[in-house]
Regions:
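Predominantly soluble domains enriched in secretory-pathway, periplasmic, or organellar proteins
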Residues: 4-6, 21-352
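C-terminal motif of bacterial Sec signal peptides marking the signal peptidase cleavage site
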Residues: 15-19
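Sec-dependent N-terminal signal peptides
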Residues: 6-13
Length: 352
């Protein structure tokens, strides 16, 4: 009897030890992909291939993780990730060619909602309301960020792209889509009505607000492939938000479509498009565009680290996956390091 009791106790202890061992040491902790811990890179992927992805660069520790969304959700993201916006604790992923916005947790990248929008490009949040440029329908979709439902739409110009909220107004860049447009729609966010249409240069793309409150918009210019003589040059346009007066600085030789501003809001960075010889830096007080790029190279997009001014330049290659890179430059323009990312990186976003 004592032997049986001893054997039973020994077996129980062995099982308990084994269970504890399995719980504590053999189970590897899951990687937590917190989008607020660095810079999130939107990789478009190849059109029609459903291989859009997210890369996460950790600023503390200088490491990079690729394919973050797929790893967390065990699912493909979709076709062409155009941009990413953070609103409160959620990340909104504009999956352009899939006609949807994927909503994930900011802290884990775990998906919890999907919103149908025709050709979503960019989004800006104003309180509990999201405004999304819907390129396909020439409108801005209005999204309730509490329910993640589309509640309305606002008709604007053709091919709406970047947008920004400033002083109770929403500014929308109408790029022209496959045609030609040179306007910025101004919308009152209280009524969601267009209150002004401003003429700028051809093909406005993206905005920035400087330390003086002026609104800058980069315009790529119009390219007429049939009659090149009808093509127009790019420009940086400065809008006075009080009077809506516009002043222009011409950009010759290429068609810029990306615009960023430093944390002091006194220096603009533009470029990041096909044909651009690099990324340019311009003081907001300048009256003419710089002759030479601040960082030379062929970049599809870029981002500025607000904490140290480093430039994160994106190199895209649609044929060779290993050639898609983020190139990190110091605030003075010196190259620091390269990192392999997903296919078609177009920008980076700092959400911390």
């Amino acid at each position: 009897m004592k032997k049986l009791l001893y054997a039973a106790l020994l077996l129980g202890a062995t099982l308990q030890f084994t269970a504890c061992e399995n719980d504590d040491s053999s189970a590897k902790p899951k990687q937590r992909y917190d989008l607020s811990q660095g810079m999130v890179i939107s990789n478009e992927g190849n059109w029609g291939s459903n291989n859009a992805s997210i890369s996460l660069y950790y600023t503390n520790g200088d490491s990079l993780a690729n394919d973050v969304y797929n790893k967390v959700n065990k699912d493909v993201l979709g076709d062409v990730l155009q941009s990413i916006t953070i609103a409160d604790t959620s990340a909104y992923l504009m999956v352009n060619a899939s006609n949807k916005i994927i909503v994930t947790s900011k802290y884990s990248c775990k998906k919890y909602a999907s919103i149908t929008v025709a050709g979503p490009r960019y989004m800006v949040a104003n309180g509990k309301t999201g405004y999304v440029t819907a390129w396909t329908n020439n409108e801005v979709a209005v999204v309730d960020l509490t329910t993640n439902k589309v509640t309305g739409s606002i008709k604007v110009g053709t091919g709406p792209e970047g947008l920004i909220v400033n002083g109770g107004k929403l500014y929308v860049a109408n790029s022209g889509g496959y045609g030609k447009d040179n306007t910025v729609s101004v919308i009152d966010v209280k009524t969601n009505a267009v209150v002004k249409t401003i003429s700028v240069a051809d093909c406005p793309k993206a905005f920035a607000v400087d330390k003086n409150g002026s609104i800058w918009v980069v315009c790529a210019g119009y390219t007429d492939w049939t009659t090149p003589a009808n093509s127009t040059s790019g420009a940086l346009c400065k809008i006075n938000p009080s009077t809506y007066e516009v002043s222009k600085i011409g950009i010759a030789g290429f068609n810029p479509d990306k615009l960023q501003i430093n944390s002091a809001k006194d220096k603009l960075y533009y470029g990041g498009s096909y044909g651009a010889p690099g990324i340019y830096q311009m003081d907001i007080a300048a009256t003419a565009a710089p002759a030479n790029p601040f960082v030379s190279g062929s970049f599809y997009g870029f981002a500025i680290n607000p904490s140290n001014g480093e430039i994160m330049a994106m190199v895209a290659d649609w044929k060779v996956a290993a050639n898609n890179k983020m190139v990190r430059y110091s605030a003075t323009g010196s190259k620091i390091k390269e990192y392999v990312v997903g296919v078609g990186p177009n920008s980076g976003y700092f959400f911390n």
